[in-house]
């Protein structure tokens, strides 16, 4: 069973002006697509691996043969991370979470604004390429970041919100202004989906 590039749940220009059409098009059809292509090449002929979901694959890298483990870690992580990322964005996004997720964010971080500050710091402080994450770890919310395309799933954590801070995610529009990109991100967060993922993970 080959891994496939998922369709976006919105048009490439739907997130403008916060994330521009050209960036979304290249990010999805080139970068994400390359991860899918290279993941399929890596697991080709290995039925046991190819039958796993990409999430199962990156959650158990120890079961991947050593000669392809790095390729699966990088490209499987890239596929899993982006597959999730697209669902966390929405042209109708922004605002604040509500319900149980909002209560837990306030409990753990002090307030929604303090959460945003800590998440933004994790995103801005990630040296080079990587991701910032809000994860559920043993039932508790925490902020973390990963290098390259490493997935929190590989650490036994469940990501419910992620921000891609590779330069390809923002450079066409924001150049070296990563903090501006991070600020714009809050305008397109799909909090309904984040809340759904939280309820499943806790």
UniProtKB/Swiss-Prot annotation:
Gene3D superfamilies: Fe,Mn superoxide dismutase (SOD) domain, Iron/manganese superoxide dismutase, C-terminal domain. It is found in: Cytoplasm; Secreted. Its cofactor is Mn(2+). Binds 1 Mn(2+) ion per subunit. Induction: By heat shock, salt stress, oxidative stress, glucose limitation and oxygen limitation. SUPFAM superfamilies: Fe,Mn superoxide dismutase (SOD), C-terminal domain, Fe,Mn superoxide dismutase (SOD), N-terminal domain. Its EC number is 1.15.1.1. The modification Phosphothreonine is found at residues 34, 70. Mn(2+) binds at residues 27, 82, 164, 168. One of its GO terms (cellular component) is cytoplasm. It is an enzyme of class 1 (oxidoreductase). InterPro entries: Mn/Fe_SOD (IPR001189), Mn/Fe_SOD_BS (IPR019833), Mn/Fe_SOD_C (IPR019832), Mn/Fe_SOD_N (IPR019831), Mn/Fe_SOD_N_sf (IPR036324), SOD_C_sf (IPR036314). Keywords: Cytoplasm, Manganese, Metal-binding, Oxidoreductase, Phosphoprotein, Secreted, Stress response. It comes from the Bacteria. GO terms for biological process: removal of superoxide radicals. Its main location: cytoplasm. One of its GO terms (molecular function) is superoxide dismutase activity. It catalyses: 2 superoxide + 2 H(+) = H2O2 + O2. Coiled coil: none annotated. PROSITE patterns: SOD_MN. PANTHER family: 37S RIBOSOMAL PROTEIN S26, MITOCHONDRIAL (PTHR43595), SMALL RIBOSOMAL SUBUNIT PROTEIN MS42 (PTHR43595:SF2). Homodimer. Destroys superoxide anion radicals which are normally produced within the cells and which are toxic to biological systems. Belongs to the iron/manganese superoxide dismutase family. This is Superoxide dismutase [Mn]. It comes from Bacillus subtilis (strain 168). The lineage of its organism: Bacteria, Bacillati, Bacillota, Bacilli, Bacillales.
């Amino acid at each position: 069973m080959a891994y496939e590039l998922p369709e976006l749940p919105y048009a490439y220009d739907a997130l403008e002006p916060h994330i521009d059409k050209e960036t979304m098009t290249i990010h999805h059809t080139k970068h994400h697509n390359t991860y899918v292509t290279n993941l399929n090449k890596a697991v080709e002929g290995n039925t046991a691996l190819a039958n796993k979901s990409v999430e199962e694959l990156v959650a158990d890298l120890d079961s991947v043969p050593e000669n392809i483990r790095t390729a699966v870690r990088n490209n499987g992580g890239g596929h899993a991370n982006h597959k999730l990322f697209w669902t966390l964005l929405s042209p109708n996004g922004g605002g604040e979470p509500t319900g149980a997720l909002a209560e837990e964010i306030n409990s753990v971080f002090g307030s929604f604004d303090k959460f945003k500050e800590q998440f933004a710091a994790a995103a801005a402080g990630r040296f080079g390429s990587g991701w910032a994450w809000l994860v559920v770890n043993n039932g508790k919310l925490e902020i973390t970041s990963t290098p390259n395309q490493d997935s929190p799933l590989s650490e036994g954590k469940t990501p419910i919100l992620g921000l891609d801070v590779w330069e390809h995610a923002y450079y066409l529009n924001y150049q070296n202004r990563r903090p501006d990109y991070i600020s714009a991100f809050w305008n397109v967060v799909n909090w309904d989906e984040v809340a759904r993922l939280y309820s499943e993970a806790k």
